[in-house]
Amino acid sequence: MHNLSYASEEDTYTDTDFTPSGNSTNSTSYSPATIIGLAGLVSFLILFTIVGNVLVVIAVLTSRALKPPQNLFLVSLASADILVATLIIPFSLANELMGYWFFGEVWCNIYLALDVLFCTSSIVHLCAISLDRYWSVTQAVEYNLKRTPRRVKGMIVVVWLISAVISFPPLISMDRNTVDERRPMCQLNDHTWYILYSSIGSFFAPCVIMILVYIRIYQVAKTRTRNMSEKRRDPDGGSGTPRLENGLSREDSRRENGHCSSSPGERKPAEDNPDADLEDSSSSDEKAKRSQNETAPSKKDRRSSRKNSSSSKHSSRKSRASSKSLDLFSSRRKRRNTISRKKISQAREKRFTFVLAVVMGVFVVCWFPFFFSYSLYGICREPCAIPDPLFKFFFWIGYCNSSLNPVIYTIFNQDFRRAFQKILCKSWKRSF
């Protein structure tokens, strides 16, 4: 994030040489062994960050389970972390180990602007994701219909524009004085207004919004869970389905007890025996022809013929009633399947919301110490001094956050875990 220097009117410091008490050094104090160790450690951090976030991008773009458009936010967030690892951390490391800025004034200006932009965009992304979660919970049907890939991409563009508006204007007033032209420093001014502006705009304000939104999401989810549990306890709830099931069981019991003269084929003419009605009608026609060919039929025969025809009509009515009950049963079954799919989708949404809450919590934990000490220095300067090694630790812990999101996805989300395994297995097979 803010790879800044803190320059007062009397002194100027690089970010790595800053101490809130006002002490600074313009040359590196690291031994060769320490330089090698730090370079190796940070190089591993850079590589891990790039590989992990590239996996996130590939997983979202190729995995069917990760296709929902809201996951495009994670692609954009991972892209910001990749840019931090490639364009910011290497130059911060060189500045730390060398003790001065080696890469010229033009790149210094670009480097500072991008550093502020990428960290600001990370937290604004998380803020947008929290709002997306909130709308999907409170306006599930309407918002899910509106949440198309095109709309999400538009929201991502807005996130980057907001980040640029927060980050770039103060950079116009940067002080670029150097203590020694032979050892130039890449630095911003440390005026109180800028420190507070950047801290509030880039961290504290989005962080407060994000936390409040997630508290609201938790409240809504808790209320819904309580309402659902009350509905389950309600004896009148869902009485339609038991009645259908009882009706079917009564029909089955009547058939078993011999009360139904029709064959089992009557129960599902539409599904298993589509020609049942046709067979009934053809048999009745044959009976009619036989009765016409018989001469001088007796009264007994006529009575039996009427009984047969009434029995056939009764059987046909039963068949139609049974068909209707089966249609009703199949529609109920389809409805149950739809409900179960919705429950699976809701469970996935809950898991995803939990994962994003972990991502946001880790981000706050990683960056809060830096911004707190940075703001404290801007307000009260020397009286609020913290040890220089501690400030450097806070500074680099913030950068480490860029590598943690893929780890969080792997630990807490099964869809990401499967996607990562599939990608890595394919890469492994191709290499052999």
From Swiss-Prot:
CDD domains: 7tmA_alpha2C_AR
Keyword Disulfide bond: yes
Entries under PROSITE patterns matching the protein: G_PROTEIN_RECEP_F1_1, G_PROTEIN_RECEP_F1_2
Spans within the Cytoplasmic topological domain: 61-72, 132-152, 216-351, 414-432
Molecular-function GO terms, alphabetical: alpha2-adrenergic receptor activity; epinephrine binding
Family under the similarity heading: Belongs to the G-protein coupled receptor 1 family. Adrenergic receptor subfamily. ADRA2C sub-subfamily.
Name of the protein in its database record: Alpha-2C adrenergic receptor
Organism this protein belongs to: Danio rerio
